[in-house]
Amino acid sequence: MAVEFPRTMIENLSVSRLVMGTNWWLGYSHTSGAKDREIRRTCTAERVAEMIQVYLDAGVDTMLGPLPLAHLKEAIEIAQDKTGKKVLYLVTPSLNIAGDAKADDESRRAIDECAKMGAPVCMPHTSSTDALVDRRARVIRDMDKFCRMIREAGMIPGLSTHMPEAPVYADETGLDVGTYVQIYNAVGFLMQIEVDWVHRMIWQCKKPVITIKPLAVNKVMPLVGLAFNWSTIRDQDMVCVGTTTPDEVREIIEISLSLLERRTPEVQLQRTRSKASVEPKKK
């Protein structure tokens, strides 16, 4: 693909607006145990590396995920070696939020591990971040401490959150973060409040937003889900999507580019006998 995917900035870091999701590569399907097991069986390091390579060749170099498991680490290294391009890994570690000195030391070690792997952005995972959101006081308790640890480790702090309140409270309190995650899709899958409320919240955010689960775990077709997200976020915001095959990656990239460029996507549609009546008549 000749066209490089559009980019945005997280503080002084240039990132692709399309972000590689990792749930489907790590066995998190949000569907069933059987689906999780199938993902783990099929998403080998070699297969994931093929997908990452397609992304990198199209200028999509940004990835969102936890401290990577061995097979994902290997996949990233394979793809980087083949393309000569570097993956920007936005890492979402789980922290110990107990609040005592021992817990803080454990969190600092986790953050240092993120820095050691070369992650430019560190976003405490929703399991840590959202447990600290205080709706009564409209603050994210202790997050300023974790943000300081992240800055001291040389990374940009962010928030991986499923709560729409988190970006709001971060902005209201002047929390030192460069970006935040938010679940956002046309059908409201896993969203805690209505889609229109989250849409307005995103547009009011002071920092760029990484929208996740745009296809609602395949509950909407790629064209539908991507059209909704790309057309209702700002130019500085991002869309993070999961894939399971290199061809899916190519389709996601082409559909996204076509939507941003306002043209018809050049992808081969799935075919069944019922489509024959709407096909162009052969001359």
Where are these regions (language model features)?
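Hydrophobic faces of well-ordered beta-strands that scaffold small-molecule active sites
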Residues: V15-T22, T62-G65, V87-P93, C122-P124, ...
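N-terminal amphipathic alpha-helix/helix-capping segment at the start of soluble metabolic enzymes
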Residues: M1-A34
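Short glycine-enriched, charge-decorated loop/helix-capping segments at active-site entrances
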Residues: G33-T42
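Structured C-terminal cap/extension of enzyme domains
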Residues: T8-R17, D36, R47-L64, Q80, ...
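Active-site beta->alpha loop and helix N-cap motifs at the rims of alpha/beta catalytic domains
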Residues: R41-A137
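Glycine-enriched alpha-helix->loop->beta-strand junction motifs that scaffold or abut catalytic
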Residues: K116-P120, R151-A153, E172-V181, Q204-P208, ...
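Active-site-adjacent beta->alpha loops and helix N-cap segments on the catalytic face
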Residues: P68-G84, A101-S107, T129-F146, P164-Y169, ...
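Active-site beta-loop-alpha junctions enriched in small/polar residues
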Residues: N23-W25, P68, T92-A98, S127-T129, ...
